[in-house]
């Protein structure tokens, strides 16, 4: 599968005055978790392959957050991880061509939090109702090259 790695960093903040119950999307996302806690992200780094949070990542998120919200907050967590991405920036979804018992839903990249539910529903309808997958996300768009 044509996956690439990209490091992403997230903050969890506590912001009682923010009081939103919807996903806010700008140069970053702010997603409510409940109890006045919010997930804020994310960064995108192609070169750093560690899963360690960095000061640079934290500073980037704080600077972007200043432009999106104007209420006081406290950072309660800072995490990092490696996200799978795909050339063309479209997810990989469907039944693996070689290992048919393997179902794939991957490569959501930076928009995973936004498109994940729709892509998952599309996969469910494909598996359970026989509906076709959207050709932009169907794993079949990457034909396996067979050596002769």
Give short role names for the model-derived ranges.
Residues 1-99:
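Active-site substrate-recognition segment that forms the wall
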